[in-house]
Amino acid sequence: MRNGKLMGDGDHDKQMPPFPRDLVLEARTAMKSSITLFWSFRSPYSYIALPRVVEISRQFGIDVDMRIVHPAALRNPEYFRTMNPLARPYFMLDTARAAAFHGLAFRRPIPDPIEQDPVTLALADEHPRARRLGKLGIAATERGQGLQFCVEVSRLLWDGRVNGWDEGSHLAEASSRAGLNLAELDASIAADPDRHEFSLEQNDAALRSAGHWGVPTIVFQGEPFFGQDRIDVLRWRLTQRISDPD
């Protein structure tokens, strides 16, 4: 090769053909065409982030590896005992504001998946609703419908249209919209509850190994992005690594 040209045996010099752009982009995308999302049903910021995660998945043509984790009250119960007294009021203000900013209907779930005194923040010993949601998320993820299940159930919990989200047919209808059968999910969990709980614990540990302790945390090529307010930074990073088909 000389000056970017191929030298033939007795032939005229030939210009090296350009490598097809679509193959270059395909190769780049194939290197790592997914993001990992650590996510909790009880986290309002997880709910607020999710529509933009879905948008990014479609925009860049990448998969979302859903990692459902326990709520913070189960991952780190000490947090509520040691938190700054200003943290809770600001949290309540900011979550409602962030939802409004992104055009999302918002109200805290009724009932709360976590049994917690609203004033003292003292936690109950058992949290059956939160544990059921987590295991349902694991079961949905195992069936390849984790992202859509979380979209539907988080709306059920957080958009304020339903009181008693855990009663009647609400969860069954949300599961159906995600292409799943709630009775089948519940039966699968009942057959092996410890395995589903272990999957949640593994995801809790994987979150910390990824470089953070809170949700939502998104990991792309080993780099963690914590918080719904880091999604634009993630989008910027993706444009550096993966072609935007739009």
Kindly give the residue locations of the regions a language model identified.
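Structural alpha/beta surface segment adjacent to cysteine/selenocysteine redox centers
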Residues: 41, 47-157
